[in-house]
Structure formats: C-alpha cells, structure tokens
Regions:
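A short beta-strand-turn-helix
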Residues: 36-55
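Conserved segment of the thioredoxin-like fold in thiol-based oxidoreductases
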Residues: 80-118
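Hydrophobic beta-strand anchors of alpha/beta hydrolase catalytic cores
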Residues: 57-58, 89
Length: 163
C-alpha cells in the first residue's frame, strides 16, 4: 500500500510541470488567470500574492524589436503615472541572453520590472505570433485585454479604464 501511494505521488510530481504549462497555455480573454513563476533580471522572484487587487500589465518584448522600442517608453511613462493607482507592469524578454535584456532596460531607463522567458511563459507567448504582446489582468485576476501589435500612446492610455 505504501509503495502504491509512493508511486502515485511520484507520478503526480512528474506531471506537475506539464499541468502547470497546460494551465498557462489556455489563457483566453475573460478567464481568471494566474501568472507562472518569474525571476526578474535582478535575480528577485516576482511575488504575485501582494499584486492581488492590482491591475497587472504583462508584456512580451525583445531588444531587437523596433515596435517594442517605440512602445516601451510610452508604457513606462504610463506606469509611472498610474503606479500609485494600483498599476503594475511586468515584462518578459524573449532575448537569448539576460545580458541583452539588461542592456536594453538600462539604455531605456525603464522602471517597470522585467524577467526572462521560461518554458511556462513561452506557452503563453506562443498563443499568438508577434511582438510586442501585451496582456492586462484586472483587479479580480480576469484577463481583460490581449494585444499583439505595437500599441500607440492612445491605446496604452486606454488601459487606464481598467484601473
């Protein structure tokens, strides 16, 4: 009996990454979502618990992406203007190296948080094709906006309606 329980436990543990990836891969507009673990470029993990009740903007970008280079300064200004109202911006770099992402963040002087893509995050990104890709999660954890394109300033300012 103990051996059977042990085997079932080991099987469940071995399937956990697959289950976690499957959950993130199914993000659809209107769903309540939970972002996967993310380690920021500074080595700190994102603690999602204190962010409950905030509006979260998640963005995928790459340092080579000209659309991201135009969108990110606008997104950063928007973040600075609305952070006190409960806005959090967390971005995920698709760069091959953390060094390239760190240089991009430093050069842009961005204040939003950034991490590197992982297999769990990659499943979310691969739902759509193109950069930048932006998701907005409302205060209740519901996915309320998905954009796969360069957002102009008016588009980004419109995110304030979720605050």
């Amino acid at each position: 009996m103990n051996r059977r329980n042990l085997m079932l436990s080991l099987l469940a543990l071995s399937l956990w990454p697959t289950i976690a990836i499957a959950q993130t891969a199914s993000w659809k507009l209107g769903d309540t979502v939970r972002p996967p673990a993310l380690t920021l470029l500074n080595g700190q993990p994102v603690n999602w618990e204190p962010l409950k009740g905030k509006v979260i903007v998640l963005e995928f970008w790459g340092s080579w992406c000209p659309f991201c280079a135009r969108q990110n300064p606008i997104l950063d200004r928007f973040y600075k203007q609305h952070q006190a109202r409960g806005l959090e911006v967390i971005t995920v770099s698709l760069d091959k190296t953390a060094d390239a992402a760190q240089q991009y963040m430093k050069k842009g002087g961005y204040s939003f948080k950034a991490g590197m893509v992982t297999p769990e995050w990659d499943t979310i990104y691969k739902q759509r094709r193109g950069l930048p890709q932006l998701f907005v999660i409302d205060r209740k954890g519901k996915l309320v906006l998905i954009e796969v394109r360069e957002m102009l300033e008016d588009d980004i300012l419109d995110i304030a309606r979720f605050l």
